[in-house]
A protein has these predicted regions:
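Mobile-element integrase/transposase regions
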Residues: 1-15, 109
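A glycine-rich, aromatic-flanked flexible loop/lid motif
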Residues: 10-22, 72-75, 96
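Short, surface-exposed connector motifs at secondary-structure boundaries
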Residues: 23-25, 52-58, 106-107
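Acidic/histidine-rich, metal-coordinating catalytic segments
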Residues: 55-70, 88
Length: 143
């Protein structure tokens, strides 16, 4: 779980959650601001969607950002174990960082995410879930 933050003049951001070990089980939610309450609301929405799709998220890996520090609340919302990476160790959550890098291909650094519609965020999630990954390309070539 991580945030992709709007540019310096923008507001809000995107909350991203990738199911560990499954880069194609990913969720994106738009946040109007970066406060804990907004993150909790977005997490509720993600968990509802995961439940509808019959996806079980058993554990979540995130960084030590202030928006993720309410461990008990997040565990209550997600019903999953929450693990934190070490400070400045983004490689410890490589799949989410790679997912965020792909988002930046569509929406560069200066993007104001508060101006995105919820439909645009849904479309982005669908695109990225089906986005070809290098491991998939190797498998297709070998077949």
């Amino acid at each position: 779980m991580d945030l992709v933050v709007s540019g310096s003049h923008g507001k809000g951001g995107l909350l991203t959650l990738v199911a560990p070990g499954h880069p194609h089980l990913a969720f994106i939610r738009k946040l109007m601001d970066l406060r804990r309450k907004s993150v909790h609301r977005a997490l509720c929405s993600i968990m509802k969607e995961a439940e509808e799709k019959n996806i079980k998220i058993t554990h979540i890996l995130t960084d030590n950002g202030t928006e993720f520090t309410d461990t008990l609340k997040i565990q209550k919302i997600t019903r999953a174990m929450l693990f934190y990476t070490h400070a400045y160790a983004s490689w410890e959550k490589g799949s989410i960082e790679n997912f965020n890098r792909i988002i930046r291909r569509f929406y560069p650094k200066r993007t104001d995410f508060s101006k995105l519609t919820s439909k645009a965020v849904e479309n982005l999630q669908e695109k990225l879930v089906n986005y070809p990954r290098p491991t998939q390309l190797k498998q297709k070539v070998a077949a």
